[in-house]
Amino acid sequence: MVHIISKKSVSFIGQSLAAKIDEQLFSKYGFKVEQLMELAGLASAQAIAAHYPKSKVAVLCGPGNNGGDGFVCARHLQQFGFNPSIVYPKESKNELMKSLVIQCETSSIPVQPNLPTDLQSFPLIVDALFGFSFKPPAREPFTEILKAVRASGIHVFSIDIPSGWDVENGAPSEASEDIIHPHAVISLTLPKMCMKSWTGPHFLGGRFVPRGLVEEHGLQMPVYPGFEQIVKVED
């Protein structure tokens, strides 16, 4: 059972503050990208395992840090008994991303550029295409994938930001075909402004934020019970 917290008990942050927090974590507080990616991916996998039965899962990964979270999530999902396949439509030249690909491929997790031809046999899709630095609209090769996912009707779990959404304002339009309309979301570090009106299942992971950073920005952080890495946010 995931501990539940009130939406009123945590801060919702915009794009600029989210970027500032990341910048300070990597500079002033000495964190490495791969550290936070591992924590984010693990928290995402834990939320998925808490909310969905073990199954095949297609993990959509973009070329940036959100995609890296997806690779880590897939690796942990396999450890939790799921059967992940990764869709990686645009490869990154970043050495960290190359390492994440190797980690998954050597763990027998398929990595391919296109959606599986048997997509309808997957009960769950994990959306890790775009993070909080995304600015709409989406472009190829992502638009066709987003449209296909939307048309599939398969349950989608988004990591941090549903792909195609404006970080401040949320989904551009309910009628838009090239954005993700998820069934559940995990916010990372803190929820972004676009999640304020979200009423579906909403998890939060980010039990690593230094106290000094919290105090500097006047942030309301969740209280994580025991040694848990995730909480569930409700009204």
From Swiss-Prot:
Could you tell me which residue ranges the YjeF N-terminal domain spans? Answer: 18-221
Q: Which Pfam families match?
A: YjeF_N
Q: What top-tier enzyme class does this entry carry? A: isomerase
Q: Which residues bind K(+)?
A: N66, D127, S163
Cofactor remark: Binds 1 potassium ion per subunit.
A GO molecular-function term, please? nucleotide binding
| Keywords on record | Isomerase, Metal-binding, NAD, NADP, Nucleotide-binding, Potassium
Recorded catalytic activity of this chain's protein? (6R)-NADHX = (6S)-NADHX; (6R)-NADPHX = (6S)-NADPHX
Q: What is its EC number?
A: 5.1.99.6
Gene3D superfamilies, A to Z = YjeF N-terminal domain
Residues annotated to bind (6S)-NADPHX:
N65, N66, G67, G68, D69, G131, F132, S133, F134, K135, P136, P137, D160
GO CC annotation terms, alphabetical: mitochondrion
Instruction: Give the cofactors, semicolon-separated.
Output: K(+)
Q: Which family does it belong to?
A: Belongs to the NnrE/AIBP family.
Function of the molecule = Catalyzes the epimerization of the S- and R-forms of NAD(P)HX, a damaged form of NAD(P)H that is a result of enzymatic or heat-dependent hydration. This is a prerequisite for the S-specific NAD(P)H-hydrate dehydratase to allow the repair of both epimers of NAD(P)HX.
Query: What's the name of the protein?
Result: NAD(P)H-hydrate epimerase
- Species of origin reads Caenorhabditis briggsae
